[in-house]
Amino acid sequence: MVSLLCCGPKLAACGIVISVWGVIMLILLGVFFNVHSAVLIEDVPFTEEDIFEDPNPPAKMYRLYEQVSYNCFIAAAIYIVLGGFSFCQVRLNKRKEYMVR
């Protein structure tokens, strides 16, 4: 039978901790980008054409903020999947401890 166990107990626990931290951080960043926080303007990928040549510059900037917000939420979802994988590895390691060799 093929074993799905590919991580040790310490690596799996570390993966859970990093995933929880990543999900919390990315959800907060996504919320802050969604409310168009002025502090995060440096992280919005805009060019001078977006500001000076656009007849309605705030609308373009708001779309860019929302795009970065969606990217943060997608990355948080990926971290949730990786956290679930790490949790499964922890469970498999626990089950391996109880098996008789």
Swiss-Prot record:
Pfam families assigned to the protein according to its UniProt record, in alphabetical order: V-ATPase_su_f (PF23489)
Keyword Manganese annotated: no
InterPro entries: Ribonucl_Kappa (IPR056552), RNase_K (IPR026770)
Subcellular location: Membrane
UniProt keywords, alphabetically: Endonuclease, Hydrolase, Membrane, Nuclease, Transmembrane, Transmembrane helix
Class of the enzyme per the UniProt entry, highest EC level: hydrolase
Keyword Lipid metabolism recorded: no
Membrane topology annotation: Multi-pass membrane protein
Any one GO molecular function term: RNA endonuclease activity
TM segment ranges: 13-33, 68-88
Major localization class: membrane
EC number: 3.1.-.-
Coiled coil start-end: none
Family: Belongs to the RNase K family.
Protein name: Ribonuclease kappa-A
